[in-house]
Design a protein with these regions (language model features):
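Beta/alpha (TIM)-barrel catalytic core signal, keyed to glycine-rich beta->alpha loops juxtaposed to Asp/Glu
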Residues: 2-170, 175
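Short, solvent-exposed alpha-helical "recognition" segments
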Residues: 197-212
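Short coil turns linking two alpha-helices in DNA-binding domains
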Residues: 191-194
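Short alpha-helical "recognition helix" segments of helix-turn-helix
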Residues: 180-188
Length: 212
């Protein structure tokens, strides 16, 4: 999470050596069956093209994963902020793939990495200028996944209600908070795996609350 900060304190070689150690650890956990995939969450890099202090080459990281576990490695996801007010990942060329400058989204596609959007509603600021449908369309056209902001079990309950197709409570609101699921417009097409994942998350949160 936010490897750019770690990179500030290291040389280029030191940073990628530590990345290899980390990737070896994650690949081990995948082979042990404890996790299925892993990825990286960026904070600053997508907005600064080839800025040395932040710059990280995802192609180099992908190649490290290939070195560790071959083409069947489990390095799969790249997360970054992406919304209608923050489109750097689709407009700023911050990556170099096979000698070609690309945006982060283009680079992920070229490397067969799945993209995950954080802050799809710009932490709520997007509602001051844009309609929900416009923000949904903007994000879903480019990204593979959208992260869900959820701080308590009630948020998870609301998400599951929407997934079941019961939008009466949600659709009646004039404003949506950042905790609402971006895929709400596609609630009838959500995969069972996704629903099960959030059901499990909900149960964990309920259990944690009961222990307080």
């Amino acid at each position: 999470h936010i490897p750019e900060i770690t990179k500030l304190k290291l040389t280029e070689d030191e940073f990628y050596e530590k990345m290899e150690m980390l990737i070896r650890w994650y690949e081990t956990k995948c082979f042990e069956g404890k996790i299925r995939y892993y990825g990286i969450a960026f904070e600053f890099m997508v907005e600064e093209p080839f800025e040395n202090k932040w710059h990280i080459e995802i192609e180099r990281i992908k190649n490290i994963a290939r070195k560790v576990s071959g083409e069947k490695n489990h390095f799969k996801y790249i997360l970054f902020e992406y919304n209608i007010m923050c489109d750097w990942a689709d407009t700023v060329k911050s990556q170099m793939i096979d000698g070609v400058e690309m945006t982060m989204i283009e680079a992920c596609k070229a490397l067969e990495l799945e993209t995950v959007a954080s802050m799809p509603f710009a932490m709520g600021d997007g509602f001051k200028k844009y309609a929900l449908s416009d923000m949904l369309d903007f994000v879903l056209k480019k990204m593979n996944h959208v992260i869900v902001g959820s701080k308590n079990p009630k948020h998870i309950e609301e998400i599951l209600r929407c997934w079941r197709g019961n939008l009466s409570e949600c659709s009646g609101r004039q404003r949506f908070s950042g905790t609402d699921l971006v895929e709400i417009a596609k609630c009838n097409n959500v995969s069972k795996r996704t629903i099960y994942r959030y059901k499990a998350y909900y149960e964990e949160m309920k259990e944690a609350e009961s222990e307080k």
